[in-house]
Amino acid sequence: MKFEQIIERIIAINHAWKLARDDFGKGSPITISLREQKSSWQANLLRLYPEASFLALATDSNMHDEDLYSVRLIKPVKTSVGLKNDAEHIPKRMAESLFTNQELNKYFNKDV
């Protein structure tokens, strides 16, 4: 799958996750499934395209109920929702369960 297609998929799943969370609650099976699916696609993006993406601490984590990382893009990408510099947030705990410590260090240590 192409880089841009993965980003579009992450955006679509993120929107669906937010709707499910608002309609059914954050503990709903569909909400949890969508959140996990989004995180899995974000992990795929970072693994398949490490030259075009990286992790950064989310600057707006204080507005959420858990610590978040931002999946950032080296260059902005034109998407169906406009120009994007990121591929949404990933909860820190999800990133820590999907990546090894070595991978986390690799995806954080980018000279951008």
PLM features: residue spans?
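Short amphipathic alpha-helical heptad-repeat segments
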Residues: K2-W17, Q37, P50
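Intrinsic structural disorder/low-complexity segments
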Residues: E8-R9, K18-R21, L45, K75
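Short acidic DE-rich linear segments
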Residues: Q102-V112
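Charged, low-complexity interaction regions
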Residues: L19-I32, F54
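Acidic, low-complexity, intrinsically disordered interaction modules
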Residues: I32-N101
